[in-house]
């Protein structure tokens, strides 16, 4: 795929929203401002098939031919997120339903269900016609499947979903006896004696379902979305030229994005809206990372696809007329946020959208241009970003210079979605590790653990955190043991290993399958009550916060106690241990990796401030390293409305201005510097 071999800029464009007289001037203005790709079509089903079976592609033929003649590249979206009125009215079984089983009505988007045979038939027909008609068009470089799979809702509760769920379960368990055992249906007399008795989780008397059913249901939702995506991809590839790529945009919940990226798509793309970190009615909080927090999501995206694209990069104020209110990017923020994406691995950045829509639900979801279509500050910033992107082309294809990894599995991701005990600690640790890494300028990767993950993939990282592997499998345990035996450091947190893959709690002490490696047994555990003071421990003479959840650990012979509680009813009990395994070691922390705790781990494990000899910077700026063929680059990003001072330890080349810099350097408000090191 040639598309990401150079960094480039794009924009989302809706030719169906505008008079054709604007098309040519719009495209020329885009090109004049450094925009070379447009995404189109993802909501335009009714333009292509106004009545059932009546396909008319002449509208987009004219636009695509104009793109070809002007030199504009096109990413064409399949418009399956917005079925036309004739379809949903004639075939109501294609609609999704709410928890009470009531069908959604026409008039929004993403109101269909993935499992309706009729919907899949209509989608397959349309996508096939599109691919056959445009699969060799010279302007098209790629295709986007649907739009934002699992956005708006990731619950699918229609009759078609219920039927498909039962088929999914029959394939997985083969017999009701196996299902009843895995789900523990003996509890509350939930035992099933006929497959037809099982349904997707509709409203019940207690607003609570069997957690093992819910875990399998979330897996089913993901499998349904992936099947829907794969169906379209397979159809496209029958007709499109090999030079064209297939992608989709995300990232949303109850979806195995890693599986989709690796086995269905050519490249993964993300929609980045940093200003949603602000609440319009909130006051500024210095401890909050605000728009800088988007780097957490970009780090997740990088685990899905190391070299990804941004399909929708925020360019203006955001919101629907009835919900969501995000303010206009201040001068400099538009380019800052785009560079934030590039710093974390994006080699393509497409802004949403070219011109703000004067009609419809998204009249406040501003584009680069306002309703009046005049040149403005935001367009000038887009042009400046495009020019700056050319100055750093040498960074294209570089990996992120991650100093440690945070392990994740899809089972634990889905379990944390349905289990509040798991979800609370998981979210707290992910947020805490991210904040600590930001404050200590320590880039990290999320590392997805799969059945086919190879040991060398883990050995890239001297330290791996597995914060809360509630669900732990034997093959995962074996891989982690091999990693440690070869010299790696594994750090685990509380609530590790107390469930199997079905969500059942095996009758064995925590940390379950890792007990042999940790040499510990969990004796006591509890959430911290809001009425209680936060527990503390002491590690290497410094305080270690134990917040949110507390465990006391019983060490075996050969396991060293590194920290004990100094407060709470667990005072004196071990909370942090270390055990040597082969050439490596395992640290077991009986708590959550809050910001303070995670920062203490990064410092004590020698991970914090990896670039401090080159760049000394306040924790108010972000530093991200990228590396390729032995060459490294540092992105220094200032998210604040005032300049920040950094100190360069040696002479470095600033790529954006071509100057050499050393000593004290000022990073202006809402600005970025890129250094070759």
Located regions from the model:
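Short, acidic/polar
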Residues: 18-32, 123-129, 251-261, 330-338, ...
